[in-house]
Amino acid sequence: MKIALGIEYNGTHYFGWQRQANVTSVQEKLESAVSFVANEFCQIYCAGRTDSGVHATGQVVHFDTKAIRSEKAWTFGLNANLPADIAVRWAKVVSEDFHARFSATARRYRYLIYNHPLRSALFPTGVTHHHVALDHRLMHQAGQYLLGEHDFSSFRAAQCQSNTPWRNIHHLHVFRQANYIIVDIQANAFVHHMVRNIVGSLLEIGSGKQPVEWMDWLLTQKDRTLAAPTAKPDGLYLVEVKYPNHFNLPKNPLGPLFLGEPKIDFNHD
């Protein structure tokens, strides 16, 4: 039997998704809980391997098991055996041809910036604090240069193991909600650190250090050393993974929850 899970986690205290020796990972904690509930070892496969300190509200995973449990039993049983910063939002029996990574058609991330002169004690994690005033409209304009299929070498980490730097960005929206600026980006897939590297350069534009057209120039140069430093992981969330409709997977609010579900309107401030 193949089971898919919708997972949410705060990545602050984890060295990323992937199991590694001598460090704590999300995969390790989830595999431990699943194996306990299933009463057999179960290897977990995820849609996107998030980096150290990165969060998720819409991670999707799957595993194979001989155990027979109801979807409700999987959800509540796993949550009872997971740490407080990892939660299962749904469980579903899926067809044998489903794969959390290879069946996915798109991934969507949100990057949250707390744009205020002073940091917040209530949100020491889960957002990236930026004290310099940012113009989200300029950031949004700059992001439109990245839409479509391009060579994203200028926004690719040196240690990236992907065979190609080509990716297809479906949308990139930047909007403000009170003191928060949200960068919402969806693509077929992402090269290593791509979202954080793009956000790093958008911050330069939003703060007035670079013009909007700089983003177009960076893209054409295909040189990572010319772009801005990588943005911190604190504000990055994997919020959605898209699959063909026939898998009929449940959907949750994109989140994170404290944002509510913002209405994006680029015709007004």
From Swiss-Prot:
Entry's Gene Ontology molecular function annotations: RNA binding; tRNA pseudouridine(38-40) synthase activity
Please verify whether the record's keywords include tRNA processing. yes
Arranged from A to Z, the UniProt key words for this protein are:
Isomerase, tRNA processing
Give the matching Gene3D superfamilies: Pseudouridine synthase I, catalytic domain, C-terminal subdomain (3.30.70.660), Pseudouridine synthase I, catalytic domain, N-terminal subdomain (3.30.70.580)
Give the Pfam families listed for this entry.
PseudoU_synth_1
The first-level EC class reads isomerase
Entry binding sites for substrate:
Y109
Superkingdom in the source lineage: Bacteria
Describe the function of this protein. Formation of pseudouridine at positions 38, 39 and 40 in the anticodon stem and loop of transfer RNAs.
User: Member of which family?
Assistant: Belongs to the tRNA pseudouridine synthase TruA family.
Q: How does it assemble?
A: Homodimer.
Name this polypeptide is given:
tRNA pseudouridine synthase A
This protein's species is Histophilus somni (strain 129Pt)
